[in-house]
Structures are given as structure tokens and as C-alpha cells.
Amino acid sequence: MKVSIIGATGYGGLELIRLLHQHASVDIATLHSFSAQSETLATFYPHLKDLEASPLEKINSAEIIEKSDTVFIATPSGIAKDIALPYVDAGLNVIDLSGDFRLKDRQLYEKWYGKSAAPIEYIAKAEYGLAEFRDKKEARFIANPGCYATATLLGIAPLVKSQLIDPTSIIVDAKSGISGAGKVPSASTHFTETNENMTLYKMNSHQHIPEIMQQLTKWDETIPAIQFSTSLIPITRGIFTTIYVKPKNPITQKELHTLYKSTYENAPFVRIQPENVYPTVKQVTASNYCDIGLAYNEKTNVITIVSVLDNLVKGAAGQAIQNLNIMANFAESDGLRFIPVYP
């Protein structure tokens, strides 16, 4: 399969390149960048020397359609809504890593992203690509989920889908490494601001909130809202999400683990920790795994779920490739079978 990557010089694009080099059924046909053309990626990223020689090109939709079966769009939000359309119309596989096609309500997108929304007919065509819970596995146009959304939804899905929790009780405390803010630096992501520091940001206003709510209410329409906070922590990669919910009825630790184990029995990239063991960010670094730990406090009647993943892999490029594997009828783990980087 021939693929093109638009946005190849960003962190998400670079991860796509790294991972696709290990995929036996995929060849990279073209690489595209808004910020640089004609040079090779190794000009900007020396770690790719002798590994990726394709030149960076301007976006030429006719050329991409001619040379590719699949297009990955790894650009900031607000770009894919315009540039994805010809590839969808041409019948190519299109996987968008931005938020442009995730929300089915155009007004919600414009409220939370502060940008004009994509045409409604294309939003309707896009399948939300939470890989473990895809509704239409044959879909060829995928809105890849956000990193926080993936960690939260995988962490809470078994309980919500079983309607075992008080729908008003969901509290999510999510923390991200600095790469989650993207490649372009800002005052808040400057080394001197992030090193030995922790910063709460976008309190009650993170753009992944409506995305999470959209999926949760598909599973349980009685959920009215969630309390969701996000923080930056001084690591390069990783999402560490702690979720608190109250069950409708008391539940044992064994019942909790049995539910999660059965839900993810056939999910190659979700690993449920043993009882009283909780995951760390380092155990999933540079991998497509989402590791989940569970606890129940009988005194407070609160379930705590800890969900960790690499925001650039399972939270972005890795899940995008997992979605490609599903749509192409490859093994779901093709190109993604590797051990996390440790320590």
C-alpha cells in the first residue's frame, strides 16, 4: 500500500514516518510540508539520515491521488477541513489526525476550536476512529481521536458501556507531556517554564471535552457532563489520566478486573494491570499500548481508573496506523509490534 503524509515535519508526522518504516505492507510514496519543500527530512531531523530520503513537497492533490492509496493528514486543527476533501472524493483512504472531523455538531466545533467547521457532508462521512470500538470497520475516512480522549475513553469504556456508574460522577484528571502541545514553541512550553513545574491549563475548556462527551453519550445517553482538567508535566511524551467514578452499586476488585479483562480480551494494545498494580508513563513510552490500572474504595464508593499512553503513538500516529490496518484488513498490530522504550 502506498501512503502520503501531509504535515510530515510535525511531531505526529514524524511518528507516522518512524512507525510506517516498520510496516511490511506499506511504502511511503510522498511527504508534504507547509513549512519546508525540496529538502529531505534529514535536513531538519538528523536522526533520519540515510533512513528517509523522500523530498518534502508542496501539496499537490492530483499527484497525491495518483501516487497514493492512503493519505495521513497530520496538521494542526483548521487545515484538514479544507485539504482532505479531494482525497475523500477520490475514494482514497483518509486518516485525519487533527480534530477537524471528530465532532458531528459543526456548532460545537466552532465553539470549542474557534474556527469555521468542515462541510457537514464530509463530517457525516468521517468515522470516529477509537480503534478498539470502531462502529464501521470498513470506513475509509477516519477522524483519529485526540490523545486525552483516547486515554479517557479507553479508561472508562467498560463501565460506561455496561451502565454500571452514576452518570453524574465522572471526574477526569489528565496530565500530558510537553510534546502534546505540538512542535511550535510558546511561553508556556518554554523549558524554563515547564522544567520542575506542573501547569494546569484550559480548565473546563479543553477541546477534547466535547469529543469525549460525544462518545460517552453514544454508550450512555444519560451522562450529562464530565469534570475534566488537563495539566502539563515536565516529560517529553506521555499521558497520565486518573479517572474517578461512583458505581451505582458496590463492586468488588475482582469484578472490576473481570469486566475490564473481558472487554479488552481481543484488544492487542490495551493491557490491564494486575490487582493493586498501577501503570506508569515509562512502561508505554514510544509504543502503541494503553495500560490501565484499577482500584475500588469501599469506604467512599469510588472507582479509580489510571490510564496511560504515549500521546504521539497511541494518542496519535500509532492509533492512525491501527485504523489503517483495520480498514485494509491487515492484522491490527502490523507495524506496531515493538517493545516500549525503557528506561
Swiss-Prot record:
It catalyses: N-acetyl-L-glutamate 5-semialdehyde + phosphate + NADP(+) = N-acetyl-L-glutamyl 5-phosphate + NADPH + H(+). GO terms for biological process: L-arginine biosynthetic process. The active site is at C147. Gene3D superfamilies: Dihydrodipicolinate Reductase, domain 2, NAD(P)-binding Rossmann-like Domain. InterPro entries: AGPR_AS, AGPR_type-1, NAD(P)-bd_dom_sf, NAGSA_dehydrogenase, Semialdehyde_DH_NAD-bd. It comes from the Bacteria. The keyword Transmembrane does not apply. Its main location: cytoplasm. Belongs to the NAGSA dehydrogenase family. Type 1 subfamily. Catalyzes the NADPH-dependent reduction of N-acetyl-5-glutamyl phosphate to yield N-acetyl-L-glutamate 5-semialdehyde. This is N-acetyl-gamma-glutamyl-phosphate reductase.
